Amino acid sequence: MFISMWAQDKNGLIGKDGLLPWRLPNDMRFFREHTMDKILVMGRKTYEGMGKLSLPYRHIIVLTTQKDFKVEKNAEVLHSIDELLAYAKDIPEDIYVSGGSRIFQALLPETKIIWRTLIDAEFEGDTFIGEIDFTSFELVEEHEGIVNQENQYPHRFQKWQKMSKVV
């Protein structure tokens, strides 16, 4: 099962130069709690944006068309969505999708759960989530994040679950 996780500002911004354009420890903690010891898929630009931080305690799948792309020990490279879907059929674990926007969009039909952090602020950046069709999803959970000295932006966490098809 694919689970997508992203944070976005008021305008749907999700990134700047491969990184998050804001500092929000609550969201980073939320992401870490959900993805620790899990399989994480991301695009090359997202992976490169992390630099050597390559998220320890996770197995990372990097999607790229570059045939000779090098990754850290806890990562592997796949070259297409079709290759990823074939890979996913052979494993029982959930796969967490962490960006970028084209990968979120491409995997939306296969996504069963979306965890979205909405940040009530506007930032500068270069990557937007784009239009996400939530009509086949249901908002099943939502809670406000704590605003304090470390977490200066109002934010809320949402869990969207794909609705079962009615026959």
From Swiss-Prot:
All copies of domain DHFR, residue ranges: 1-162
Gene3D superfamilies, alphabetized: Dihydrofolate Reductase, subunit A
GO cellular component: cytosol
GO MF term (any one): dihydrofolate reductase activity
The protein's name: Dihydrofolate reductase
PANTHER family xrefs: DIHYDROFOLATE REDUCTASE
Gene Ontology BP, a term: dihydrofolate metabolic process
Pathway: Cofactor biosynthesis; tetrahydrofolate biosynthesis; 5,6,7,8-tetrahydrofolate from 7,8-dihydrofolate: step 1/1
Function: Key enzyme in folate metabolism. Catalyzes an essential reaction for de novo glycine and purine synthesis, and for DNA precursor synthesis.
Annotated residues for binding of substrate: D27, R58, T117
Gene that produces this protein: folA
EC number, UniProt record: 1.5.1.3
Annotated residues for binding of NADP(+): 7, 13-19, 45-46, 64-65, 99-106
Catalysed reactions, as listed in the record: (6S)-5,6,7,8-tetrahydrofolate + NADP(+) = 7,8-dihydrofolate + NADPH + H(+)
Coiled coil: none
SUPFAM superfamilies membership: Dihydrofolate reductase-like
Family in the record: Belongs to the dihydrofolate reductase family.
Protein species of origin: Enterococcus faecium (Streptococcus faecium)
Swiss-Prot/TrEMBL keywords: NADP, One-carbon metabolism, Oxidoreductase
EC main group: oxidoreductase
